[in-house]
Design a protein with these regions (language model features):
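Bacterial N-terminal signal peptides that target proteins for export
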Residues: 3-13
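A residue-level marker of the well-folded mature domains of exported/periplasmic proteins
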Residues: 5, 26-364
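Bacterial N-terminal signal peptides
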Residues: 12-22
């Protein structure tokens, strides 16, 4: 799956079809032939503690906004033979807005969107788009930058850790953003990264977090799907920052903040456009940040001093006002300039990010 993801993103970048909020939409607005009926396809169980649960927590907020109950089906694997019947069961019952939650749904959703041109399809972390299909993902580097600020401020050693799944663009940008945020508060901060090779592997995540604590790291961030790194941080008497959703419920003493999905803020406006008949799917997909909904910081644990929170919230507002996290000059660990002075890293550069800042130490 990892190699397939890399192949997709490389192809999209080469074609110029990288998700971007600024890309031109399809000329004609999509119109449903009947009142909208919305359904979700969940990749995992609804209470997985991370990615899927973030969608399930957004669902009741969406229900309130659109005035209808939204059913879902859990644990739909990234296999066409499972995705297609799950979606078609809803379509045959009159559901005409299908929301998916997995990269591996991309090709099947494209096929379904062509087979059912009067049904609207949206898919999180997907790569395919069309006149009635829009993939979307969030600018998580923005929220991870803010978490990095808190980590840098709260660390006594200046040694931060980060448990990550795979060294691919959307993970690497969270790591580099975390380091940039930490440097904002502590110019000597470093981030040691251990890749687990899996999105959801509590055993490997625990081993990675334990190894970090053994090295004297006193704040652990993450881009994996379970709260295990936060649980280990609490067990070891150190701090952590979460990902996907507010993870303080699992480690109330340790988790300082989280980079959290706020999908209702993105999906409610999109669904209202679908209902109004003026939805124009972005041909390159949607890429919302804090300003547009999709991602934000869940802040903060009461142990974080007010002056730190105030600085973080000021940076959050600066991001909303247009500040770009990856503003040059920036160099990678080899000393190569990756973002020139006076320039910002564009979306294509974000998706293909394969470099780390000098303060990032990647371990196997």
């Amino acid at each position: 799956m990892l190699e397939l993801q890399k192949k997709y993103w490389t192809t999209l970048i080469a074609a110029g079809a990288v998700v971007s909020c600024g890309a031109a939409a399809y000329a004609a607005g999509f119109t449903l032939p009947a009142a909208p009926k919305i359904a979700f396809l969940y990749f995992d169980q609804k209470n997985d503690g991370g990615w899927t649960q973030a969608f399930d927590e957004a669902r009741p907020k969406i229900e309130t906004a659109v005035g209808m109950k939204i059913p879902f089906v859990e644990k739909v694997p990234e296999v066409a033979g499972q995705i297609k019947p799950a979606a078609e069961q809803f379509i045959q019952r009159g559901y005409n807005v299908i929301i998916g939650t997995a990269f591996g749904y991309s090709d099947t959703f494209k096929e379904l969107s062509e087979k059912y041109p009067q049904v609207a399809f949206l898919n999180a972390s997907g790569t395919t788009n069309g006149s009635n299909l829009e993939s979307f993902y969030g600018r998580t580097y923005e929220s991870q930058y803010l978490c990095g600020m808190i980590a840098g401020a709260m660390s006594k050693s200046g040694k931060l850790g980060f448990v990550a799944a795979h060294p691919i663009g959307p993970v690497n940008w969270t790591i580099n953003a975390y380091e940039l945020g930490a440097l904002k508060m502590n110019p000597k901060a470093t981030v040691t990264v251990i890749f687990t090779g899996a999105w959801n592997d509590p055993v490997k995540e625990r081993a990675a977090a334990q190894a970090m604590a053994d090295q004297g790291i006193d704040v652990i961030g993450q881009h994996v799907d379970t709260p295990t790194p936060q649980i280990v941080a609490q067990e070891r008497g150190i701090y952590g920052t979460g990902h996907h959703r507010d993870l303080r419920e699992f480690a109330p003493k340790a988790t300082l903040c989280s980079s959290a999905w706020t999908w209702e803020k993105f999906l409610i406006p999109e669904l209202k456009k679908v209902e109004a008949g003026n939805w124009q799917p972005n041909p390159y997909g949607a890429f919302p940040g804090i300003k547009d909904g999709g991602t934000d910081i869940a802040c903060c644990n009461t142990v974080v001093p007010k002056e730190v929170v105030d600085k973080v919230m000021a940076e959050r507002q600066a991001i909303i006002d247009g500040k770009h996290i990856f503003a040059g000059p920036l160099k990678d660990t080899s000393g190569k300039e990756v973002v020139p002075a006076g320039q910002n890293l564009g979306d294509a550069g974000l998706w293909k990010m394969d470099w780390f800042l000098p303060g990032v130490i990647a371990q196997k």
